[in-house]
From Swiss-Prot:
It comes from the Bacteria. Residues 7-20 have a biased composition (Basic residues). It comes from Clostridium kluyveri (strain ATCC 8527 / DSM 555 / NBRC 12016 / NCIMB 10680 / K1). GO terms for cellular component: ribonucleoprotein complex; ribosome. One of its GO terms (biological process) is translation. One of its GO terms (molecular function) is structural constituent of ribosome. NCBIfam families: rpmH_bact. Residues 1-20 are annotated as: Disordered. Belongs to the bacterial ribosomal protein bL34 family. This is Large ribosomal subunit protein bL34. PANTHER family: LARGE RIBOSOMAL SUBUNIT PROTEIN BL34M (PTHR14503:SF4), MITOCHONDRIAL RIBOSOMAL PROTEIN 34 FAMILY MEMBER (PTHR14503). Keywords: Ribonucleoprotein, Ribosomal protein.
């Protein structure tokens, strides 16, 4: 077996970043929930 997590900053931002979240309704709901909860970091 090999390590399945090979971190890449660009890929992480593209998949889970703020702009990607804002594109879809469900993504905006994620941001909204995290704001309500008082998360320090909203996205990756």
């Amino acid at each position: 077996m090999w390590m399945t997590y090979q971190p890449k900053k660009k890929q992480r931002k593209r998949e889970h970043g703020f702009r990607k979240r804002m594109r879809t309704l469900s993504g905006r709901n994620v941001i909204k929930r995290r704001r309500q909860k008082g998360r320090k970091r909203l996205t990756a």
